[in-house]
């Protein structure tokens, strides 16, 4: 895809120039933030006592990003993703991930996501069911990018890569 080609062409240069490792999470996070502007029902939080009795629609995107640690999965929150560039998002995810692995996240850094992304693809996952992280109202599960055979002009070719996304 265009994203994979862009990353392959630029990741080494950007790492050298900025110190930021270009992955896929920054681009997917930015794409989600742009889509959430147009789909307010997916960018909401469920609030109230018990199971929640109020849906609050947000005009900002505070994105929860699942991070695996020795103690389990945590979801630190990148605030105001809609106002960030892809490299800024990558940097924020990296910094929060390091804090998570060092058990140094504050409660504020782990609460208030309006939408969450879980990337099981880093573990080779081909499919799965992401678990909604309240108070957010939606989650995106990303999975491994794999080469797949495609029939092109009657011949089987392995020239396309695909991933499964679910919510």
Predicted regions and their residues:
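C-terminal catalytic/motor cores of large multi-domain enzyme assemblies
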Residues: 1-167
